[in-house]
């Protein structure tokens, strides 16, 4: 039987990993072994980061809503409870956008939540 060599295949595979390591510092961009290890680690960090981004944005929206509601004499939790009682179904992202861009409309929503709390 003829001897089988995988030169082209191996080179292509290694080249693929080196290409993914573009922009890394030192041997992590040129050495196959180091590049492969770093790309695997980077992919793991990216996966975790995609999950954390959702948490970070939710907490940012909550901070913004809380900051906008405090001058009206409510805390974030009582405001959200008031919204629930008033049957207002607006997500936190939209509430935070309203608080920043349309403060008058946001104040109307706060007043409705206050009314629902007083009943």
Swiss-Prot record:
Gene Ontology BP, a term: translation
Pfam families (UniProt xref): Ribosomal_L20 (PF00453)
Annotated keywords: Ribonucleoprotein, Ribosomal protein, RNA-binding, rRNA-binding
GO cellular component entries: ribonucleoprotein complex; ribosome
Gene name, Swiss-Prot/TrEMBL: rplT
Family membership: Belongs to the bacterial ribosomal protein bL20 family.
Annotated NCBIfam families: rplT_bact
Protein name: Large ribosomal subunit protein bL20
């Amino acid at each position: 039987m003829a001897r089988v060599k995988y030169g082209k295949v191996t080179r292509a595979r290694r080249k693929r990993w080196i290409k993914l390591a573009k922009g890394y510092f030192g041997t992590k961009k040129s050495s196959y072994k180091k590049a492969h290890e770093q790309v695997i680690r980077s992919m793991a960090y990216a996966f975790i980061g995609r999950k954390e981004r959702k948490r970070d944005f939710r907490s940012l929206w909550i901070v913004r809503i809380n900051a906008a509601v405090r001058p009206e004499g409510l805390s974030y939790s009582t405001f959200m409870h008031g919204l629930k009682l008033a049957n207002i179904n607006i997500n936190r992202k939209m509430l935070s956008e309203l608080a920043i861009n349309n403060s008058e409309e946001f104040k109307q929503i706060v007043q409705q939540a206050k009314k629902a709390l007083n009943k």
